[in-house]
Amino acid sequence: MSYLFNNYKRDNIEFVDANQNELIDKDNNVYLDFSSGIGVTNLGFNMEIYQAVYNQLNLIWHSPNLYLSSIQEEVAQKLIGQRDYLAFFCNSGTEANEAAIKLARKATGKSEIIAFKKSFHGRTYGAMSATGQKKITDQFGPVVPGFKFAIFNDFNSFKSLTSNNTAAVIIEIIQGESGVLPADPLFMKQLNEYCKQKDILIIVDEVQTGIGRTGKLYAHEHYQLSPDIITLAKGLGNGLPIGAMLGKKNLGHAFGYGSHGTTFGGNRLSLAAANQTLSIINDADLLNDVQSKGQFLIENLRKSLVNKRNVIEVRGVGLMVGIEVTNDPSQVVREAKRMGLIILTAGKNVIRLLPPLTITKKQLEKGIEILTEII
């Protein structure tokens, strides 16, 4: 008997321990992790982060946002660098997107936001309403009004939906949940230029793509894009719950006293994890290594799977990789688990790989070998 709602399709396995890039179940079986807890433990189970959280645990766990927090300032500075942003901390990606939606509407005085079909931005009401998947929004009654949905990578589709009441566009640089679908560079260039011309805010959802996942701190850096608002979570706390919304300083007037808030946002334990995570990831050598390992993974998967009739395409950026297949990918996930490899699905027919950024070449080779055997 379970005391939990049945809203997750749980596998009959429980992980009780971990060692860097490996997971250990209650029967002491060891698994190579190509999921990072769905893009969360980007640095694996890292002892430096453990020590940072432990040190904070010995000081103060929580204090309300009615008082100063030097660790919030420190993490914000690491996220912002030389960019002209301000930061708001929350607990998750969906909360970061809720904050972005509120900021965009209040700052512009406009209500319409353009999102994209097949997108995913979260499951709370505002973020769910911005999600372009009916399976996410069905059966929950009326969604938040004001959202329109364009075809991803189709500039004319986007442009046709804009109006004088368009506050913002919200976009994932790579549509992760729908199949690891990267944005087209020309499309992003056209969208960026048009939005700047029309004073439409650009919200980039970096919840899954941010914090080094693609070999840049932020995936939008691959496109020379300067978003008005950035949302973050997942890898930011390397396993501890935290989200963040970064907004351009010229939007700061819209979030004055009492305009938005959260009880647990900026929690000191989560910030301690984020602080150490960013200290490690904000390193050019590490990020270059992610790009190199991502290229190695994609190229070798393409070579190994070239004669597999059920493989349509291998695609991705950095260590965010999708293998599109003709059959049900959940079969591959089950077989991979049996052989000691933890992987994910995305969309209807994509195997999603999100290994830790600290994955070794030898571990990548092992994963490729297993996938080649079972696909």
From Swiss-Prot:
It catalyses: N(2)-acetyl-L-ornithine + 2-oxoglutarate = N-acetyl-L-glutamate 5-semialdehyde + L-glutamate. InterPro entries: AcOrn/SuccOrn_fam, Aminotrans_3, Aminotrans_3_PPA_site, Class-III_PLP-dep_AT, PyrdxlP-dep_Trfase, PyrdxlP-dep_Trfase_major, PyrdxlP-dep_Trfase_small. N(2)-acetyl-L-ornithine binds at R123, T262. The modification N6-(pyridoxal phosphate)lysine is found at K234. Pyridoxal 5'-phosphate binds at G93, T94, F120, D205, E206, V207, Q208, T263. One of its GO terms (cellular component) is cytoplasm. The keyword Kinase does not apply. It is found in: Cytoplasm. SUPFAM superfamilies: PLP-dependent transferases (SSF53383). Binds 1 pyridoxal phosphate per subunit. Pathway: Amino-acid biosynthesis; L-arginine biosynthesis; N(2)-acetyl-L-ornithine from L-glutamate: step 4/4. Its cofactor is pyridoxal 5'-phosphate. PROSITE patterns: AA_TRANSFER_CLASS_3. Its main location: cytoplasm. GO terms for biological process: L-arginine biosynthetic process. May also have succinyldiaminopimelate aminotransferase activity, thus carrying out the corresponding step in lysine biosynthesis. Homodimer. Belongs to the class-III pyridoxal-phosphate-dependent aminotransferase family. ArgD subfamily. PANTHER family: ACETYLORNITHINE AMINOTRANSFERASE, MITOCHONDRIAL, AMINOTRANSFERASE CLASS III. This is Acetylornithine aminotransferase.
